[in-house]
């Protein structure tokens, strides 16, 4: 033994010991909170098992049943038992919410929660092991509280969910085994190891003290050896060294052969007494928002509940491996509750600072109000807090004092006092809430009137310029008055209005108005601008032509922020879509759609063209084809649809023959535009350093061979640490998604979970990935974990279909999928539900993309057509669709330009076509 020895201790293992102890003592709220903060889980699970655990701990019961569907066809899997476990937990939680609502005297919500509980009970009937079990569950409906039943005396959602997972885990472990990649995560702490180590540590201190007393001649009797134990402070032997072990090693062997009397150690543990109030708060708070009957429902736990329990049991699937983050979920819940599904998801995404949309709120948990649309300052904001700030403060005091004060009355008296005190508060709240809802309805009517003015007020050519200017000024004055009512900052708006009036005056003398902030130009006689007013922006314009009322205009892309130029310039709406109207009748679709977009460039190849991608700057686009050829073409400097009666060949700036050994299936530019990645059925990913100015390669290719099948899609995102580009790639073969640090040339992660070939990828938010697969699912992945954080199936109606393309709108709230059954699905990411599934095409939808402002959805299909869907209306109802392009063979990919109203389409007819808006 050397003079110095080293013992390696991992903090992760210490946390696992603590987690095991908390689990053994049923302190599951604390256990899950520790998992959330540390990112450590006490267990050895596969990625799929971790995801199943996350779904159960989140209370996503429908998703759990959907996730487990592939196992239900196996004979060995006890489908009936598994469904019984899940549905029983769902029933108990619905019952728990019902009890909490009853205690708070909320009759409006009580009916809904009772209905939810009854529905769960009916679903349980066919899966119950016996009639007696079903009768016992029915009996629970008659109890005032679930905890009044002896079996559920100590029941709480956190513990119940953990136990539910443990039971489910035993059933599915055989089918979802831990995989070899997780073996380094360490072993699971068990058998109350922390308690054992504490006791052994105490005994070690006693031994050290006893040996020291023998060495110094101090007399300590055998009965006194254990009397000096102090678990919290120790006995003074705090030095961590090997002196005792070294001393024992120097003792002669004969010492250890001496006979001794074996003694037993009796350990008496004073059990922890949990506060009864904490347990009740756990029942009250985490489940109510989960069962909200509609998005605008004001059911939210009171802020004062944070004094008793700060952890939400319904967190977002956006965070740590264990899925316990509550911050983003709280934001998501708020967003869902303030916007009915009839509002366009695009309306949420306004990049400007000022935002007048009543459905958009401050997404900050520290802000407890939205932009109030009423000059009445005492009106409570129901979307953010169910009671006014004064009432909220009173509620906080009334609940915190009994929990913490020394002069607490009995529990029954406390509850009666709280209920009596809260009755008046809730009555006042409902009165104020009714006033506020009426006020919102009035404001919504005004907003619709303003929008009607926008659509009708500036399109009649027969009105003289003076009348048009008067209309503009009248609308501006009304809008300014409206802004004042809404208490929104008006800094600098006066200058903008002056500039608008000057521009209106200037437009009298000449008809030359710019129509683009980039190179998009039109002749003076055809130029136009539209009067537009969205939530936080005002523009003015002159009409286009007498027939423009039947024309489908694309207006500004970003409805926020002033786009006013200098005094010598005209108002230039940013190229892209806007809150303009794309609505039209079905009969007009085929007749007028060809006029909306015209073909200006066609690139021909010898074989089918699969992949296209615009450079981030918009001046170039890459094309990859089955002929193994990679091209980079120039985007036209000037876009003039009238000058392109006959489509021209684009200028090819860069070309490389046989770039791959096989067909090029996908191409992608890095965010900085300096890397061009391609994927092929030769199973290689190539990354080409590229200079956009010289249009040439700037270094040797990077080649990655981690895939064992065709690479079907690629995507880039910025690296959070190195700042370099992170390449995301996926395809056939092992069905994994691979992430690669291109700056270092190193692989980062292999994300497994899909059971079919991955056909599509999409990235957003700097760390989120969406993937579509032939296994008929879309998976969301969080690279901060990294693991799958949500699975979205396509079996909402029917048997589902392979997902060929995925896209997420710029706000990160709406997912669009293109599927092989000719359907498109719109999915509310934050709400966790499907908004609509519709069939815009008659064959496979191979490409879907949101316009940069998310007002329109571009789709390409094997039916040879390219269509645009208007997303500005009620997303739950039939959406306006128009044909904007057509090929002679299957359409494979479509991509919007980064700035202009243009898009690329690639096809099996061996062409790539550039289409632009025929403005």
Curated annotation (Swiss-Prot):
What positions are modified (Phosphothreonine)? Answer: 285, 542
Picking any one GO biological process from the record gives: corpus callosum development
Q: Which residues form the signal peptide?
A: none
- Where is the protein situated, by its record's location annotation? Cytoplasm, Cytoskeleton
Domain of life of the native organism? Eukaryota
One Pfam short name: LisH_TPL
Q: Where is the composition biased (Polar residues)?
A: 517-551
The residue ranges of the LisH domain are 10-42
Q: Which residues form a coiled coil?
A: none
Boundaries of each CTLH domain copy?
45-102
Phosphoserine PTM positions read 289, 292, 297, 312, 422
Q: What is the protein's quaternary organization?
A: Interacts with MAP1S (via WD repeats).
Instruction: State what protein this is by name.
Output: WD repeat-containing protein 47
Q: Which gene encodes it?
A: WDR47
């Amino acid at each position: 033994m050397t003079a110095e020895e080293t013992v390696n201790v991992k903090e992760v293992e210490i946390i696992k010991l603590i987690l095991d102890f908390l689990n053994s003592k049923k302190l599951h709220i604390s256990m899950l909170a520790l998992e959330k903060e540390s990112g450590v889980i006490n267990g050895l699970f596969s990625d799929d098992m971790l995801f199943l655990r996350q779904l159960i701990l989140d209370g996503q019961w429908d998703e759990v049943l959907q996730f487990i569907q592939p196992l239900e066809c196996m004979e060995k899997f006890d489908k009936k038992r598994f469904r019984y476990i899940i549905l029983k937990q769902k029933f108990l939680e619905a019952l728990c919410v019902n009890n909490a609502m009853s205690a708070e005297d909320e009759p409006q919500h009580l009916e809904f929660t009772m209905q939810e509980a009854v529905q769960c009970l009916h679903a349980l009937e066919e899966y119950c092991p016996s009639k007696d079990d079903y009768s016992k569950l029915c009996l629970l409906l008659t109890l005032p509280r679930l905890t009044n039943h002896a079996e559920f005396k100590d029941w709480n959602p956190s513990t119940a969910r953990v136990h539910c997972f443990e039971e489910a885990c035993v059933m599915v472990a055989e089918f979802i085994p831990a995989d070899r990649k997780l073996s380094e995560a360490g072993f699971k702490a068990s058998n109350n190891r922390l308690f054992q180590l504490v006791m052994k540590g105490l005994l070690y201190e006693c031994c050290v003290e006893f040996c020291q007393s023998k060495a110094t001649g101090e007399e300590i009797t055998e009965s006194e050896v254990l009397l000096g134990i102090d678990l919290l402070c120790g006995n003074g032997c705090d030095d961590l060294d090997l002196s005792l072990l070294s001393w024992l090693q120097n003792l002669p062997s004969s010492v250890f052969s001496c006979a001794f009397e074996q003694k037993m150690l009796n350990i008496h543990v004073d059990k922890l007494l949990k506060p009864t109030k904490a347990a009740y708060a756990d029942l009250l708070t985490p489940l109510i928002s989960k069962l909200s009957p509609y998005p605008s429902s004001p059911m939210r736990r009171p802020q004062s509940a944070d004094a008793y329990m700060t952890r939400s049991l319904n967190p977002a699937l956006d965070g740590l491996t264990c899925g316990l983050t509550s911050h983003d979920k709280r934001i998501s819940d708020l967003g869902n509750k303030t916007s009915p599904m009839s509002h366009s998801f695009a309306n949420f995404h306004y990049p400007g600072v000022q935002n007048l949309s009543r459905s958009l709120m401050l997404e900050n948990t520290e802000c407890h109000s939205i932009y109030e649309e009423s000059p009445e300052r005492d009106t409570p904001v129901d979307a953010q807090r169910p009671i006014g700030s004064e009432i909220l403060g009173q509620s906080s005091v009334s609940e915190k004092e009994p929990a913490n004060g020394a002069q607490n009355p009995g529990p029954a008296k406390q509850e009666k006092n709280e209920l009596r005190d809260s009755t008046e508060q809730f009555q006042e709240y409902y009165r104020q809430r009714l006033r506020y809802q009426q006020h919102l309805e009035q404001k919504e009517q005004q907003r619709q009137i303003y929008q009607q003015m926008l659509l009708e007020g500036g399109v009649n050519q027969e009105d003289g310029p003076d009348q048009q200017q008067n209309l503009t000024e009248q609308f501006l004055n009304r809008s300014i008055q409206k802004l004042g009512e809404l208490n929104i900052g008006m800094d600098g708006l006066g200058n903008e209005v002056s500039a608008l009036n000057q521009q209106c005056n200037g437009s009298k003398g000449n008809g030359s108005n710019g129509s683009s902030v980039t190179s998009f130009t039109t002749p003076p006689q055809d130029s136009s601008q539209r009067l537009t007013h969205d939530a936080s922006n005002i523009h003015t314009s002159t009409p286009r032509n007498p027939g423009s009322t039947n024309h489908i205009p694309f207006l500004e892309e970003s409805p926020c922020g002033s786009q006013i130029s200098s005094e010598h310039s005209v108002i230039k709406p940013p190229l892209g879509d806007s809150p303009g109207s794309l609505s039209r009748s079905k009969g007009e679709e085929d007749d007028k759609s060809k006029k909306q977009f015209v073909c200006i460039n066609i690139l021909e190849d010898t074989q089918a063209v699969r992949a296209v991608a615009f450079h981030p700057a918009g001046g170039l686009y890459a094309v990859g084809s089955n002929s193994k050829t990679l091209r980079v073409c120039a985007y036209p400097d000037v876009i003039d649809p009238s000058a392109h009666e006959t489509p021209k060949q684009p200028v090819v700036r860069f070309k490389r023959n046989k770039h791959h050994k096989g067909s090029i299936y996908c191409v992608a530019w890095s965010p900085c535009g300096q890397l061009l990645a391609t994927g092929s059925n030769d199973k290689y990913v190539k990354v080409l350093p590229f200079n956009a100015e010289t249009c040439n390669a700037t270094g040797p290719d990077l080649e990655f061979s981690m895939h064992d099948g065709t690479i079907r899609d690629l995507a880039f995102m910025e690296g959070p640490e190195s700042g370099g580009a992170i390449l995301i790639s996926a395809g056939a073969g092992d069905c994994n998604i691979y992430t690669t640090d291109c700056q270092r040339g190193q692989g980062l992660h292999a994300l497994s979970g899909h059971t079919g070939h991955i056909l599509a990828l999409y990235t957003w938010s700097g760390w989120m990935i969406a993937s579509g697969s032939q296994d008929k699912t879309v998976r969301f992945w969080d690279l901060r974990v990294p693991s799958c954080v949500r699975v979205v199936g396509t079996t909402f109606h029917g048997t589902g279909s392979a997902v060929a393309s995925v896209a997420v709108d710029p706000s990160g709230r709406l997912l669009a999928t293109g599927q092989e059954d000719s359907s498109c699905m719109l999915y509310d990411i934050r709400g966790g539900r499907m908004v609509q599934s519709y069939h815009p095409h008659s064959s496979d939808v191979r490409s879907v993309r949101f316009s940069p402002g998310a007002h329109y959805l571009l789709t390409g299909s094997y039916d040879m057509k390219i269509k645009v869907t208007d997303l500005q209306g009620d997303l739950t109802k039939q959406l306006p669709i128009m044909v904007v392009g057509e090929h002679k063979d299957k359409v494979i990919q479509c991509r919007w330009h980064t700035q202009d109203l243009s898009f690329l389409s690639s096809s099996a007819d061996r062409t790539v076509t550039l289409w632009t808006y025929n403005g």
